[in-house]
């Protein structure tokens, strides 16, 4: 079943993720050219940090989430632009990296991931055709979940991958959810209900002009059309007959040499007979098939297209069989020289047009370098590859029904949109496992060729002499512009965090704040500093007045001052007569001991003061009230119930007055909302005596 168009797919993803109230939903689709699962579409349903786009009308939450998903994709395209657009790529996006939450970063970075079948959660779900449920995605190792580091920062705890629509639907949640089969059926129902109608099943013959309609009008992958080549549905019957005659002649020659050969030659003969038997088993089904086709009077070839088979085109992404079919009939008549010439040309064309392939197990295959090879060169990997292709074709509900006359063999034109390559059955045309150099050469080409093309486009000149190793290393290294941009983003983030910490500290020093924004905090701080300066001036003036009053009192009481002077003189005489240590003792006796300070009395009628400030995710709570047992614990429990997690506490108790300062982190709920200052204050006042 082909993937639906983009708008319908996004609508299904939106309906599914909103119905289960999860954070995001993604669709991984199979890229026909690369054979891997890549990003198809997605919908973000999580928390939104800020909205920079000002809309003329009020929009609903669904429309806002849909616009947010589109803005995140535009931001990724903007950030992944080429070096030529380095200076102008940021303004084209409605968002900037500083405006995203951690969960939005996780959703954004998922666009850059791809998974071969069998690798990662989407790859395993696609290969096994079973759902994969991962709980605790932020706690597992990167080998289990490749995006574990991103999930840890975004607090994504549950990830589910469900194979649907010839791809994989992935849903993620920031909460821990246990596996539920009812959840899987519920998600599948949204996609099964939108099942597209099956394509028509036309009947094709030699003179038929019926075409198969492509199932998708919106191509997802674009690639240049393949050159028009021809692949035989079966190898030429003449070549099979000639090969069988050659084998019979070899068997007769071996039988004649049996009398004179020694034991070693007999063992070689047995090996040859074993290979010959294998070849006959491979050829006999094809001969019987041709014989049955010759006996049937029908000349109609039926092609039934199924939604399960994936034979399609690289250009339209629908992977349906090419609509343009032409039946070419090669006559078997003629002299033996023409027949032999056609066989040789078939061999040459098969060898020339076989591309460098890679089997499903990841091993590279390449064409033989020269003429026919013996059957003993058929390796186990080649046999496994042919059996795998045969099994896939046999398990499909669609089969080719071919009929032709006894004097003709049918050959099917290979379309430029078909994803099948030519597959001859002759042992001489089987392909051998490539050595390590071919795989290394393929990797070298993949790494170096894109870099060379980009270099020509930027420099507009021919390349100079440079080694291949230097080219590959330069390609793998990030450009200075990318490193500078990444460093700038990190530095800007650190600066913002440090600035927020400074504002939190400044807010804790100011006893009153009108608003919680940074400008209001600065304005209130300025007013508070002015008040402090005024208080200092008042205190200094009061101190001067007290000093003047003391001087006036001392001058108005001369007798007391004279007695004090006489006492000082007596002390001085005692010190001079008795010496240092004794004088000090007498002096200490002479000095009157001041009375001890009175114990502090408890303050009566202490007023309750509660100050709460919240800046982004940081919160500060200041509390002053009458003390009671367990008050601090009750305050922390109330804050936790309002999703305010306390990180630091400073408290003191003086004369029955309890003073506390609590620093905390504010968490968001499922809808991305944070508790307000009024709610926190009201909850604290309810528990204060």
Curated annotation (Swiss-Prot):
Which parts of this chain are annotated as the region Disordered?
192-287, 458-489, 547-570
Q: Where in the cell is it found?
A: Nucleus
Species of origin reads Actinidia chinensis var. chinensis
Q: Name the gene behind this protein.
A: BHLH42
Q: Where is the bHLH domain?
A: 483-532
Q: Outline what the protein does.
A: Transcription activator involved in the spatiotemporal regulation of anthocyanin biosynthesis specifically in the inner pericarp of red-fleshed kiwifruits. Functions in association with MYB123 to activate the promoters of LDOX (ANS) and F3GT1 that encode the dedicated enzymes for anthocyanin biosynthesis.
Q: In which tissues is it expressed?
A: Expressed in the inner pericarp of maturing fruits.
Primary localization class, coarse: nucleus
The text of the family note is: Belongs to the bHLH protein family.
Which SUPFAM superfamilies does UniProt cross-reference here? HLH, helix-loop-helix DNA-binding domain
UniProt name for this protein: Transcription factor BHLH42
A Pfam family annotated for this UniProt entry: bHLH-MYC_N
């Amino acid at each position: 079943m082909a993937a639906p168009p983009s708008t319908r797919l996004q609508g299904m993803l939106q309906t599914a993720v909103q119905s289960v109230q999860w954070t995001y939903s993604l669709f991984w689709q199979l890229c026909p050219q690369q054979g891997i699962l890549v990003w198809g579409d997605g919908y973000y349903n999580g928390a939104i940090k800020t909205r920079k786009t000002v809309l003329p009308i009020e929009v609903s939450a669904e429309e806002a989430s849909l616009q947010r998903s589109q803005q995140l994709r535009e931001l990724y395209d903007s950030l992944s632009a080429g070096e030529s657009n380095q200076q102008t790529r940021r303004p084209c996006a409605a968002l900037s990296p500083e405006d995203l939450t951690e969960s939005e970063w996780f959703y954004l970075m998922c666009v850059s991931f791809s998974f071969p079948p069998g690798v990662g959660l989407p790859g395993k779900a696609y290969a096994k055709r079973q759902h994969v449920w991962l709980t605790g995605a932020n706690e597992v190792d990167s080998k289990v979940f490749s995006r574990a580091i991103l999930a840890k920062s975004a607090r994504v705890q549950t990830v589910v991958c469900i194979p649907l629509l010839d791809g994989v639907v992935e849903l993620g949640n920031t909460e821990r959810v246990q596996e539920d089969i009812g959840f899987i059926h519920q998600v599948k129902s949204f996609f099964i209900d939108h099942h597209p109608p099956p394509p028509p099943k036309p009947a094709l013959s030699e003179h038929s002009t019926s075409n198969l309609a492509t199932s998708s009008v919106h191509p997802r992958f674009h690639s240049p059309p393949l050159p028009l080549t021809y692949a035989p549905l079966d190898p030429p019957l003449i070549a099979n007959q000639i090969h069988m005659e050659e084998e019979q002649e070899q068997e007769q020659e071996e039988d004649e040499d049996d009398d004179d050969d020694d034991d070693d030659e007999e063992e070689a003969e047995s090996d040859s007979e074993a290979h010959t038997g294998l070849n006959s088993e491979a050829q006999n089904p094809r001969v019987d098939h041709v014989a049955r086709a010759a006996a049937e009077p029908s000349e109609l070839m039926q092609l039934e297209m199924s939604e399960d088979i994936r034979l399609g085109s690289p250009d339209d992404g629908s992977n349906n069989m090419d609509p343009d079919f032409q039946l070419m009939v090669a006559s078997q008549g003629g002299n033996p020289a023409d027949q032999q010439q056609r066989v040789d040309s078939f061999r040459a064309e098969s060898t020339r047009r076989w591309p460098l392939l890679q089997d499903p197990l990841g091993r590279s295959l390449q064409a033989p370098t020269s003429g026919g090879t013996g059957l003993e060169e058929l390796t186990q990997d080649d046999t496994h590859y042919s059996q795998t292709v045969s099994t896939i074709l046999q398990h499909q509900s669609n089969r080719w029904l071919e009929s032709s006359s006894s004097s003709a063999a049918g050959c099917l034109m290979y379309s430029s949109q078909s994803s099948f390559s030519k597959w001859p059955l002759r042992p001489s045309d089987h392909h051998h496992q490539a050595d390590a150099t071919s795989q290394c050469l393929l990797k070298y080409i993949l790494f170096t060729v894109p870099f060379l093309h980009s270099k020509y486009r930027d420099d507009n000149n021919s390349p100079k002499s440079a080694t291949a190793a230097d080219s590959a290393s330069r390609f793998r290294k990030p450009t200075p512009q990318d490193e500078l941009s990444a460093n700038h983003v990190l530095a800007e983030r650190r600066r913002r965090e440090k600035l927020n910490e400074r504002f939190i500290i400044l807010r804790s020093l100011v006893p009153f704040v009108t608003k919680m924004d940074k400008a209001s905090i600065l304005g209130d701080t300025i007013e508070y500093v002015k008040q402090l300066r005024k208080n200092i001036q008042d205190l200094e003036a009061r101190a001067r007045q007290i000093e003047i009053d003391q001087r006036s009192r001392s001058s108005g009481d001369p007798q007391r001052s004279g007695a004090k002077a006489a006492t000082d003189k007596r002390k001085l005489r005692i010190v001079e007569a008795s010496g240092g240590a004794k004088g000090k003792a007498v002096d200490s006796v002479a000095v009157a001991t001041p009375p001890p300070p009175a114990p502090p009395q408890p303050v009566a009628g202490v007023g309750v003061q509660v100050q709460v400030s919240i800046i982004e995710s940081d919160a500060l709570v200041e509390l002053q009230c009458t003390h009671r047992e367990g008050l601090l614990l009750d305050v922390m429990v109330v804050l936790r119930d309002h999703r305010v997690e306390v990180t630091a506490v400073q408290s003191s108790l003086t004369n029955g007055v309890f003073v506390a300062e609590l620093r905390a982190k504010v968490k968001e709920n499922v809808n991305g909302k944070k508790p307000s200052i009024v709610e926190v204050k009201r909850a604290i006042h309810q528990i204060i005596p």
